[in-house]
């Protein structure tokens, strides 16, 4: 099983991919890999998601996660497609148990202290903070660092190139997630060279950010 926290901490930006045509998955993955991306999340939001996930997994440089996973059956499908981790918008004990059974890493989503406590009781330590900006962004994450020092967050939702530095400076943020690295419209338009440029820029920017002391 992938050490998801180490992988996230190394890359610091997790591209969220929404793919409508499975034929776009491999060239998209190759473009991202050429920019230095090694970790991606493909959202299970379209009819093409599962096939696209499997296609992305065929790109040897990439470790692929299934995102927007809501049910245990989707965990099984993701594992069958060779996904190495699963991300959910919320916390489901059934989904976490399925991840354990299928040997894939899990990143459940949280929005409140109660949900964080529940997720940690279930054994999770790397959590998606969603929707980050609407929940108060870095100010809320700072407040949560006191009672939950053991948790590493992946803020997603409203995080973009303009504000990611604020998040990456937080000591309890492992990485930020977002679709701005590979916008759905750019994937549809087959703008893979442009996506590679955006991904490379995001990785360079993330690499320069230094966490504040915890």
Residue ranges and their predicted role:
Residues 1-84, 101, 161-162, 188-214:
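Conserved N-terminal beta1-alpha1 strand-loop-helix module at the mouth
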Residues 13-17, 40-42, 64-67, 86-87, ...:
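Hydrophobic faces of well-ordered beta-strands that scaffold small-molecule active sites
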Residues 28, 71-81, 114-122, 139, ...:
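Catalytic cores of alpha/beta
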Residues 44-45, 69, 91-93, 111-112, ...:
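Short, ordered loop/turn segments at secondary-structure junctions
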Residues 85, 89-95, 128-137, 172-194:
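Glycine-rich phosphate-binding active-site loops on the catalytic face of alpha/beta enzymes
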Residues 92-126, 130-135:
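Histidine/lysine/aspartate-rich catalytic loop segments that bind and position anionic ligands
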Residues 118, 134, 139-157:
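Shared catalytic-loop signature of beta/alpha-barrel
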Residues 146-212:
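Hydrophobic secondary-structure block in the mid-to-C-terminal portion of proteins
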